[in-house]
UniProtKB/Swiss-Prot annotation:
Residues 24-119 form a coiled coil. Its main location: nucleus. PANTHER family: RRNA-PROCESSING PROTEIN EFG1. GO terms for cellular component: nucleolus; preribosome, small subunit precursor. Belongs to the EFG1 family. Involved in rRNA processing. It is found in: Nucleus, Nucleolus. Residues 196-229 are annotated as: Disordered. InterPro entries: Efg1 (IPR019310), EFG1_rRNA-proc (IPR050786). This is rRNA-processing protein EFG1. It comes from the Eukaryota. The keyword rRNA processing applies.
Length: 229
């Protein structure tokens, strides 16, 4: 019996794989239509469908949603690459010139002001190269972006802070040394995103909360010890 069950399981897996195969690398409209069809099927006939079919369709639906998301990200990257190619090209050259100038100045006089200027120039250069391909590019040089909204300025600041943090913990997709060697983001890489910043912020908040809870717990224990002495 176990062999029969295994054969049925393999056939179901093969059927699901074949269903997914026809949607891989297909247009988003085709994927969306299939998602809607599956959603309607599960909504209308969930009470009468066998449980194994429900599980199978739900897994296919989840896989299709992921495929749609990946397709939309790739399409967004393609559009942004075409739209902002020249802007990023000139900003990269400008940021590189400023970095080399700041480095030369710092080597001539290693004071705090020159050190800070060099660090800022490094952030700017890494910002331009590692800015996420999936996002509308935000110019690092504000004098070239006089019509920027308050939200744009906030996002620019957030990206700069994120890049600065990733320089410190050496987690940039393209490091400064690689940039100076002429390297850029690969076609598959997206770059840094604000999701990274939010994740970092949440981890910091959680760490602070745990620290506060430990502190409160220690104080409560001390008060109890004092009470029973």
């Amino acid at each position: 019996m176990s062999g029969v069950r295994m054969q049925k399981k393999n056939r179901r897996a093969l059927g699901q794989s074949l269903e997914m195969a026809q949607f891989l690398d297909s247009g988003s409209n085709k994927i969306k239509r299939r998602i809607r069809d599956l959603e309607r099927l599960l909504k209308k006939k969930k009470d009468i469908l066998p449980s194994n079919i429900i599980v199978e369709k739900e897994r296919t639906l989840e896989a299709l949603r992921l495929e749609l998301h990946n397709h939309e990200v790739k399409e967004n990257i393609r559009k942004n690459a075409k739209k902002y190619h020249m802007v990023r090209f000139f900003e990269r050259k400008k940021a590189l010139r400023r970095y080399k100038k700041a480095l030369k100045t710092y080597k001539a006089d290693e004071n705090e002001a020159n050190k800070e200027a060099l660090e800022n120039a490094e952030v700017d250069l890494c910002y331009v190269v590692n800015f996420p391909k999936s996002e509308k590019y935000i110019s690092i040089f504000t004098e070239d972006d006089t019509e920027a909204s308050a939200e744009t300025n906030l996002r620019r600041k957030a990206f700069r802070q994120l890049v600065r943090g990733k320089i410190a913990d050496k987690s940039l997709p393209v490091s400064l040394s690689n940039i100076l060697a002429g390297k850029k983001l690969s076609e598959e890489a997206i770059g840094v995103t604000l999701d990274d910043a939010l994740s970092r912020s949440n981890q910091t908040d959680a760490s602070h909360q745990e620290s506060d809870e430990d502190s409160d717990s220690n104080e409560n224990e001390k008060e109890e010890d004092d009470f029973f002495e």
